Amino acid sequence: ATLRALIKVTENIGNECYLGKEDTEAILEKTEKDIFGLLQNRNRMSDFVPIQQIVLNSLSAIEEASKTKGRVTGVATGFTELDYKLTGLHPAELILVAARPAMGKTAFVLNIAQYAAFKDNHAVAMFSLEMSKEQLVTRLMASESMVDSQQMRTGDLRDSDWEKLLEGAALIGNSKLIIDDTATTLAEIRSKCRKYKQTYGIELVVIDYLQLMTGSESRRNE
């Protein structure tokens, strides 16, 4: 069955290449998505869930919520009030953080990724389209070690500061945080998310920030 499905995928991709209606990037993304689905032993029919089962799943979720009474059931953000309202971050949720420029959006999402990866040991992928991975790690080290970032930039550090920095560096280095500053398009981010999920089992994806993402001409609106 898997071989037949693979043959069907390759036939469809070949036809799309000959038709030339989609650009190369879109075809590559679709190819990867279809083959990844085969690797996960999934296909369109097995993804179908009867409405009755969906209703039961929803009722079970509501029943579980009534038992937990607002306790965090997803990935905690570290912000008490936010966790109470959301009960954590859950699979398939898309949450947008919106604010005026220079209001601390990057710092906010970085704190969430930091808490999830360092405090709760979740696998987190953070895509940074503005800051380099080195810049982000430097900010994380300043936060975790409680050493002034300006002192880190100038190198004006005491022995005690170095001890704190090394402790912070060890915590970050042993975590499941993935920082990627190379993906710039929607297709690249999707592709890497699939790979990171398969390889590292990521539970949270953070993108900073959406306006800097680019897309292929045929999928720019998406």
Where are these regions (language model features)?
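Short, small/acidic-rich helices and loops at N termini and domain boundaries
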Residues: A1-T68, A92, A98, A102-M103, ...
